[in-house]
Amino acid sequence: MNKGVFLCVGTGGHVLPAYNVIKSMLDQGIDKKNILIVTDERGIEYFKEKDFETIVYPFVSSRKGITGYLLNLGKILKSIIYLYKSLKKYKPQFLFTTGAYIAPVAAIVSKLLKVNFYIQEQNIYSGLGNKLSAPFAKIVYTSFPDTKNIQKNKIQYCGPVLNLDLNNNNEIKKTPNLTIGFQGGSQGSKEINDLVYKFCEDERYFDIDTVSYTHLTLPTRLLV
């Protein structure tokens, strides 16, 4: 059976965009049986109890950049062989990844399978995984119109991937006390932090007794 394969690993920053794309496809009538998810032990936590067909594998991650991947080249080659053999029987129509350390593996496997390969890049500066994989991609969908360090002829700007289920605010209206949270991602954190500090300077927003604010950031980014 032909399937669309979605490859996403690690934390919610990479897994949730893939899940939101999948959910939009399901809402448009795509059968869940035509979707296969490839992830790791961290990523699978976001798909538990959602009844998707999945492949879970300990893909190599690195905190030392490209050096860490070179030191684990044997494990990476093993993961490529494993994924190629696993996906071959499904005869996938395409491979789609949201980046991180699985992206280069997905790129090579897509070439071995001779199927189209697509990338979604959330940040304005592409991470190492997507940067290395972009030359293999048919299209790189971006959240920003001016995404850096990826070939311009590969980019198709589509805007950020959103969770459309959040448009129902009935529960918020029923809550007498409201807490607003601010949290930035790996590359969006500075912009969001700056916005929070600017927001805090406006005393109008702190005269409301029923509203409180929580700002999640690193200690080194905290302004006292």
What feature does the model see in each segment?
Residues G65-F94, L112:
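An amphipathic, basic-hydrophobic alpha-helix
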Residues R42-Y46, P92-L113:
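An aromatic- and histidine-rich active-site surface loop
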Residues L113-N168:
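Active-site-proximal region of nucleotide-activated glycan assembly enzymes
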Residues V56-S61, T98, Q120-N123, S143:
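Short beta->alpha connector loops at strand-helix junctions that form conserved
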Residues H14-L26:
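Short amphipathic alpha-helix
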Residues G4-V9, K32-K75:
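Conserved nucleotide-sugar phosphate-binding/catalytic loop shared by glycosyltransferases and other
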Residues V38, R42-E45, K50, N170-L216, ...:
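Donor-nucleotide binding loops and adjacent catalytic segments primarily
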